[in-house]
């Protein structure tokens, strides 16, 4: 005789009813997150397809494309738990060519001098600082200096002047907080900051996403909250127009490796814990690609010169390797690249090459003047002076990222 359990709802105790309803609702609640996990799997497959389709003719350019990250902190300046070994290993595993450290300052030591510098494991490191000025502005200084520790006692204008006198670079950090827009001695600005973007995370939704997706797709969960930095890009376009001069755009990884929890011994050895923003993951999301003439080596001087000139572009390489992207201009006298000025003369031809077919936006003085999909090379005749830049989108990756930039170029200034 077989015994079968036939639950009788009327005879079931109240707590069992509540428990059964709760379990049923919980299971139903998971369905959207299971679907979201499937979509991340599809995104991974689409990214792999994009990378497999890449075509790059390195001989067609007089420049070498070096990729790296800017705005990185270690435990040296506080606000971070990361150490030098973590950073070096993360950079190496990501295949980076350079890392610009931006240590917070200290009253007892020159953190720009004490941080990573030179070449480690094949990666070039530049020692810099992030500072808060007495004007309540924040700047990235590269290279940094011992003087950076006093930045909070003087105004932004003095900090910028001191940096320029040393022949060093200054970039506006967190432009949504910056107030000294009347000044002009900065070299550029962060038009994208990863930490700022993470503030848009819905932590309730992300918690349940993590239950299903974190183990397999922790990096691609970024696609859920990544947004085009509309306000920063608009401010950048307006700034160039108002100042009538070059303003270089960079992306800040703002890597701290300080999100998560752990239990460990007094030596710092972790016994158990979860690390939500390891350097290796942060370095994979967004990079700055700097173009350096092929006959010149990658060194601190050539890297900083490339950044200062705007010979660089921002790429969200998490969605596909952008190496090989070029944006140049030709007139009857020669060729220039992004960051350069070129005379209109009898006309200019803008040339865009991309490693894969993509959607290409050509933007003049902040306004889109061309929007074409499915192109890997585009040429545009130009008959008007203006500031021209490019945004590239990978529409083939699907709805999660198709409307979010893959590449943001620096401008070509047609004079």
Placement of each model-derived feature along the sequence:
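C-terminal functional module detector
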Residues: 2-45, 50-62, 243-249, 253-415
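A metal-dependent hydrolase metal-coordination microenvironment
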Residues: 40-213, 226-236, 242, 247, ...
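General secondary-structure edge motif
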Residues: 67-71, 216-219, 270, 287, ...
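Short, surface-exposed, polar/charged, turn-prone segments marking secondary-structure boundaries
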Residues: 95-97, 126-130, 152-155, 198-201, ...
């Amino acid at each position: 005789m077989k015994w079968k359990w036939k639950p009788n709802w009327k005879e079931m105790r109240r707590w069992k009813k509540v428990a059964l309803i709760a379990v049923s609702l919980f299971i139903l609640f998971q369905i959207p997150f299971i679907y979201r996990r499937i979509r991340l799997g599809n995104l991974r497959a689409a990214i792999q397809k994009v990378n497999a389709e890449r075509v790059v003719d390195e001989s067609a350019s007089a420049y070498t494309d070096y990729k790296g990250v800017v705005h990185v902190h270690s435990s040296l300046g506080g606000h971070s738990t990361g150490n030098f070994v973590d950073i070096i290993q993360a950079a190496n595993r990501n295949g980076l060519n350079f890392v610009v450290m931006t240590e917070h300052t200290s009253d007892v030591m020159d953190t720009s001098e004490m941080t990573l510098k030179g070449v480690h494991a094949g990666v070039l490191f530049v020692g810099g600082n992030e500072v808060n000025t007495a004007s309540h502005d924040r700047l990235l200084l590269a290279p940094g200096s011992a003087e950076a520790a006093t930045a909070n006692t003087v105004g932004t204008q003095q900090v910028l002047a001191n940096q320029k006198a040393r022949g060093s670079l200054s970039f506006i950090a967190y432009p949504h907080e910056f107030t000294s827009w009347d000044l002009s001695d900065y070299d550029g600005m962060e038009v994208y900051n990863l930490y700022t973007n993470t503030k848009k995370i819905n932590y309730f939704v992300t918690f349940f996403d993590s239950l299903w997706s974190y183990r397999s797709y922790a990096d691609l969960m970024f696609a859920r909250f990544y947004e085009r930095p509309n306000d920063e890009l608009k401010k950048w376009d307006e700034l160039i127009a108002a100042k009538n001069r070059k303003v270089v755009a960079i992306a800040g990884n703002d890597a701290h490796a300080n999100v998560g929890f752990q239990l460990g011994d007094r030596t710092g050895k972790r016994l158990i814990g979860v690390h939500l923003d390891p350097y290796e993951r942060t370095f994979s999301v967004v990079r700055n690609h700097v173009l350096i003439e092929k006959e010149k080596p990658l060194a601190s001087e050539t890297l900083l010169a490339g950044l200062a000139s705007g010979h660089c572009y921002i790429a969200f390489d998490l969605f596909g390797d952008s190496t090989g992207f070029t944006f140049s201009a030709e007139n009857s006298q020669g060729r220039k690249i992004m960051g350069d000025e070129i005379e209109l003369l009898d006309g200019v031809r803008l040339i865009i090459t991309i490693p894969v077919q993509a959607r290409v936006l050509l933007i003049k003085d902040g306004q889109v003047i061309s929007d074409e999909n499915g192109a890997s090379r585009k040429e545009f005749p130009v008959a008007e002076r203006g500031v021209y830049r490019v945004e590239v989108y990978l529409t083939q990756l699907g709805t999660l990222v198709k409307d979010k930039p893959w590449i943001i170029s620096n401008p070509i200034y047609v004079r």
